[in-house]
Amino acid sequence: GNKIIKIMDLAIATGVPMIGILDSGGARIQEGVIALGKYGEIFKRNTMASGVIPQISIIMGPAAGGAVYSPALTDFVIMVDKTSNMFVTGPDVIKAVTGEDVGMEELGGARTHNQTSGVAHYLAEDEVDAIDYARALLSYLPENNLSETVVYAAEGELEITDEDQKLNTIIPDSPNQPYDMRSVIESIVDGHEFLEVQPLFAPNILIGFARVDGRSVGIIANQPQQMAGTLNIEAGEKAARFVRFCDAFSIPILTLVDVPGYLPGTDQEWAGVIRRGAKLLYAYAEATVPLVTVITRKAYGGAYIVMGSKQLGADINLAWPTAEIAVMGGQGAINILYRNEIKAAEEAGEDVAAVRARLAAEYTYNVASPFLAAERGELDGIIEPAATRISVIKALRALRTKRSSLPPKKHGNIPL
């Protein structure tokens, strides 16, 4: 314990990242309160280091009992498939207390924490893969909150390329047909390289690091291929934590939006989507780093506001001509706005589907058009999809000297 505490103090004092490699059964039972006290001192230092230096935990074996809280307090947790385990209470104790039969892998294995709990951020194939991912993460991060990320010499080309042109045809004709947002991300970033974080957890939202114009950026994007890109509790919490990490270490954030709204259902409401969904709103509103947002297709209701909107403090908001920005989608809106016309069409024996399609198209043109939002100052520009990469480069260049501060306070009260 003393050795760990000493190196943690040194990392904080010298402003260098801290990496923990864990393979521990927990506290030594025979040492009693002394061992527990050392864990408490480690947890406190994890907390003091948060937002000061990057902290990465690599789990290469068991991490049980109190030992799991140290990696939980770090920024990134990497687990090795079929080797790592994390749990507060082990299978034997669970069996004795509740009668429930569960194996170590199912209870707290690497796949469980990557897919189900969201505790882990990367599922490594083996220990070498885990270390390689940690190295890749560090390449995008500064040494501490007062230093800058490494800037690579390669600057972005400011002419539309053949690769850029592919974005002009990526949005399907049907608004209900999905597409892969990763393709959009890879077309914007340097070298088409996107280091995704938590790819298996809440896959309806993508988060990760890349470089644009040779500089590190954090990217948050809805994924239409998963749950139509809707926001749910897990996606909101995943993105909120990532926004706060990027803000703590002065990494600009690029947000790509295609969100039809929040996932409806009693499960979400009863699990606290109001409180827990507000975390992402809070994170964006509190962030002072450069914020650039591009709406590719849908941006409806409260989800539009939450996803890096101008109202929450985004610096530059752009949209493709295919964008739809409104309180709700066309089909839902016409049920309320044009219920009498639809009822009259039914009574007259008209083609109701054709009437609904016409009314929805009128609603989209008259209410949800991005050009209306641009006219009212809610957007800073409508851009050709092929020009996205160039527009993002120009926006981030303009924001390099951004200075912003929050009202003086001890700390805010995020809805945890």
Identify the meaning behind each predicted range.
Residues 1-416:
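Ligand-binding clefts of soluble mixed alpha/beta catalytic domains
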